[in-house]
Amino acid sequence: MTIMRKKHPLLKMINHSFIDLPTPSNISSWWNFGSLLGVCLIIQILTGLFLAMHYTSDTTTAFSSVAHICRDVNYGSLIRYLHANGASMFFICLFIHVGRGIYYGSYTLLETWNIGIILLLTTMATAFVGYVLPWGQMSFWGATVITNLLSAIPYVGSTLVEWIWGGFSVDKATLTRFFAFHFILPFIITALVLVHLLFLHETGSNNPSGLNSNSDKIPFHPYYTIKDLLGILLLLMVLMFLVLFFPDVLGDPDNYTPANPLNTPAHIKPEWYFLFAYAILRSIPNKLGGVLALILSILILAAFPLLNFSKQHGLVYRPITQVLYWIFIANLLVLTWIGGQPVEYPFTMIGQIXSICYFTIIIIFMPIASTIENNILKLH
């Protein structure tokens, strides 16, 4: 069998990626989240496939078909809530994965980092179109508000919005195409994941010390397969706890009301994992400015390699930048909270302050801190 896995064209690829892969001996549990994301993706594709067998992408029957899945299909409600809460687990793992990349300086692996940003954007697009499918109140109005933002694009905006809608409002054509997008995008994500891994295995993984670990590597199997397995079991435990005890805790009650274009909900908001970006969007009174800030809130990740002036790799031995990093994380949590609050004082003001902090910490304070640290250590 040893000869087989090293010689066979297909098994050889699997062997080089998951069995004999040379891995730094000191990577911590923060490196588990890549494999957890893979598991989340598999769960989402499988549960989504079974949901698609019973779902109908028609405005008159979409809401009823979701109710039918929950009531009449064997384990339908389990599959539906696994899919909905699986998306939340996916984004929790995704944010931790990106946060670990920032903390330990993984953005120096340029190709891997940039493909990761594309993956994040694609996943966000997938989650957004998926949220529209149950055709509840928040689905309809979320789709209307967010797609309408494209009308802020000068000259072509209005035409672009009508082109995406397939008419003059969010209607049957919109729902059908969103279902098509939601079905195809996870497979595009899977392809991008393979490219992400391809680039990662070209350079090898980063490690907590930030030093070159070529002299101290161990095979991925069995050391990290067993470690990943523990992470997967913990993930599944948390997911099943959510699904079986609190299936609706991360959802919106408004989505249990069928979509009604004549009745606007008191407070339109997206799913919790978009609230930080939504808060940044709302903090700018100008429509085009808000849209640009929304896009930049994600694309700013691409600036990390450019704004990295430190002579050290990662933040492990950089106390000033460490403090800034944790302020940034706290700020992100504040933005998430503000995104779910009504548009009124003091929430609007807090949102504006937090949005300014979000960008200034990354663009101004972190580069200044790294320069100060270089001077303190006389590494310049």
UniProtKB/Swiss-Prot annotation:
GO terms for biological process: mitochondrial electron transport, ubiquinol to cytochrome c. Its cofactor is heme b. Keywords: Electron transport, Heme, Iron, Membrane, Metal-binding, Mitochondrion, Mitochondrion inner membrane, Respiratory chain, Transmembrane, Transmembrane helix, Transport, Ubiquinone. The chain crosses the membrane at residues 33-53, 77-98, 113-133, 178-198, 226-246, 288-308, 320-340, 347-367. GO terms for molecular function: metal ion binding; ubiquinol-cytochrome-c reductase activity. It is found in: Mitochondrion inner membrane. Its main location: mitochondrion. Signal peptide: none annotated. It is a multi-pass membrane protein. Binds 2 heme b groups non-covalently. Heme b b562 binds at H83, H182. CDD domains: cytochrome_b_C, Cytochrome_b_N. It holds the Pfam family Cytochrom_B_C. Heme b b566 binds at H97, H196. A ubiquinone binds at H201. The keyword Metal-binding applies. GO terms for cellular component: mitochondrial inner membrane; respiratory chain complex III. The cytochrome bc1 complex contains 11 subunits: 3 respiratory subunits (MT-CYB, CYC1 and UQCRFS1), 2 core proteins (UQCRC1 and UQCRC2) and 6 low-molecular weight proteins (UQCRH/QCR6, UQCRB/QCR7, UQCRQ/QCR8, UQCR10/QCR9, UQCR11/QCR10 and a cleavage product of UQCRFS1). This cytochrome bc1 complex then forms a dimer. Component of the ubiquinol-cytochrome c reductase complex (complex III or cytochrome b-c1 complex) that is part of the mitochondrial respiratory chain. The b-c1 complex mediates electron transfer from ubiquinol to cytochrome c. Contributes to the generation of a proton gradient across the mitochondrial membrane that is then used for ATP synthesis. Belongs to the cytochrome b family. Heme 1 (or BL or b562) is low-potential and absorbs at about 562 nm, and heme 2 (or BH or b566) is high-potential and absorbs at about 566 nm. This is Cytochrome b. The lineage of its organism: Eukaryota, Metazoa, Chordata, Craniata, Vertebrata.
